Amino acid sequence: MKKIISLLVCMFLLTSYSITAQKYKRKKQQNTTQFEEKYYDAMQWRNIGPYRGGRSAAVTGVANKANLFFMGATGGGVWKTTDAGNSWENISDGFFGGSVGSVAVSEWDNNVIYVGNGEKTVRGNVSSGDGVWKSVDAGKTWKHIGLKNSRHIPRIRIHPKNPDIVYAAVLGDLYKSSAERGVYKSINGGLSW
């Protein structure tokens, strides 16, 4: 008798769950806005860049400038757009290239940009980098400011009111022990860590 009651309770619970799920699915479908195909059938996809960038996991915007974004590519340096992505310009060529794991722009002074080299997506084949780079003129020029053997820097954070205070999360060598690994702090704009 206990088995029959248990079986009936289970069937009841499963049935009520199924009914609830169907109601939710129908409700969700009713709220979907659909547009007639004539409004978008002439549209065509196009690549707006950046070109030769490779994959990217390092993208940041600038809080008070809605159309300004920076992107760090795994195989193509740092790119900048001032028109919300319609066009891109490489701003690191001639200074550094290769793999970028993080890009940070100061909220206090948008001309100050820090870049951490080295891919941050840990995979079988990753590109390493050579530390932290800094620009004080919105990417026109760059200076290497340390952590040369860090290899992979997935995150950089800048103090919101003082661009000289910066933190860098450093992975170091992914496949063996590494002297440069951990969270580093600079209080002098990267002169020392």
Feature annotation, model-predicted:
Residues 1-25:
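Bacterial Sec-dependent N-terminal signal peptides
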